Amino acid sequence: SLIVSSDLYKFTNTDFFNDHEYFYIYRPQHKLTYRIVSVYSYDDRHIMNSFDFDDDKVFQEYLDYIQNPRSFTKVVRDNSELTINDKIVTLSTCLNSGDGRLLLQGVLIKDELTK
């Protein structure tokens, strides 16, 4: 299903979040299936410029945060344990009020070859 940035807010509703466990990214000859781990509000820092993901300890700390974000707006899927071997993707949109971002985090669970 197609997710546009305005759709990300739907995932802050616990029922919607629980009813929509996966999203898909299509690449040439690949269908990538991601399990949604969490959605939460975050500040406006550029994540890739703010963390040294080459450092395994820093990356694991970030993954731990994804699973337990310090945010008033958050929904987290139970039984999601992320490790530095996981491949994650972040979908992001502006917050409706103030500075910051709404982030949806997914973990790759399947990479299917397509024709």
Where are these regions (language model features)?
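Extracytoplasmic/periplasmic soluble domains downstream of a signal peptide or transmembrane helix
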Residues: 1-115
